[in-house]
């Protein structure tokens, strides 16, 4: 089922925004075809972290991830960062050859920074290019702000939900902003 035109969408939830001091606590992937039709959802993985690591989260992350149940899932998880990387690669290898898909998502450069430091084999699986939906969001906000009114994100800050939102948002921009 591998197709070099398929797109890999990824989202990470982290303990904060600093890849040198914060860590990945959840990850999910979705593979779409080039027309944004979902082909498969990968594993949704809560990555185990110690209570000591979780205690270093700032107020926003503590409230957000605690309220969504993610912090508890991370505590209960037995999956290490290395195992999460392995499971995700195992899934992706079924759908996209190495080096063919850009890394796809929202503000994806931030996710890529964490992958580079904490999951380098997974980061290297992607093409060097990024498909960042937030680029279109920024352009639409400046060039056609009325388009922004037609799309609302769920905002759960759970990895799989965030990817679904990103794909839906790109579909929205394709229909209302990009003239093809």
UniProtKB/Swiss-Prot annotation:
Keyword Cytoplasm: yes
GO cellular component labels: cytoplasm
Domain Exonuclease residue range list: 7-170
Gene Ontology BP, a term: DNA metabolic process
Residue ranges crossing the lipid bilayer per the database entry: none
InterPro entries: Exonuclease_RNaseT/DNA_pol3 (IPR013520), Oligoribonuclease (IPR022894), RNaseH-like_sf (IPR012337), RNaseH_sf (IPR036397)
Domain of life of the native organism: Bacteria
Active-site residues (renumbered): 128
Keywords: Cytoplasm, Exonuclease, Hydrolase, Nuclease
GO molecular function, one term: nucleic acid binding
PANTHER family: OLIGORIBONUCLEASE, MITOCHONDRIAL
Protein name, UniProt field: Oligoribonuclease
Organism encoding this protein: Stutzerimonas stutzeri (strain A1501)
Lineage, top ranks: Bacteria, Pseudomonadati, Pseudomonadota, Gammaproteobacteria, Pseudomonadales
